Amino acid sequence: MFGKYEQNFNAHKPLSTIAKFKYGTMPKKDKLGTGHYHAFSGYQIVGTYPEVMFENPQLIIVARGVGGCGDVKYTPANCYLTNLSIAIITEKTMHDDYLYHYLRLHDTKIMNTGSAQPQITVATLEKFEIPIPPEEEMIRFSDFVQPFKQQYRNNHDENKLLSKLRDTLVSKLMSGELDVSDIDI
């Protein structure tokens, strides 16, 4: 899908043509660890927070740090995004799907501007040129990837649930609270 537009430089436009950007913010230390929402750095969940920034999974780019500056990913649902990342906000799901896959397939680390520590700025993202296919093709692409995206999220949620179950069962087995010696396998 992306290949035929790569060489057509008339199709290249600034990323700001189909997206807006929002910096995550530094969580207040006295609030970190309180609340029911995930505090997400772009690298991982770093605790809980009482405020939510995004209710649905949000497309982001990690904007600071040696280990992953330029990585493109989705946040968990119901999260507060910290200042290490920038949200890539689109009005249409098809743009979200296209940008996620396009940016993951290309070297976004070339946008790094920091000298001591790599960083990506909103200004750099706004000017970054990408090929933008016709809307009909983006719709077709989005329709194709949606079932895979949903299955990935379902599998991720199930893995989290199974991990919690494992941790609970192992704890009960180790404490003697649960006895499985009579089970015949």
Question: Language model features by range: what are they?
Answer:
Residues 11-133, 184:
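DNA target-recognition domains and sequence-specific DNA-contacting regions of bacterial/archaeal
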Residues 1-41, 131-180:
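Non-catalytic DNA-recognition/assembly elements of restriction-modification systems
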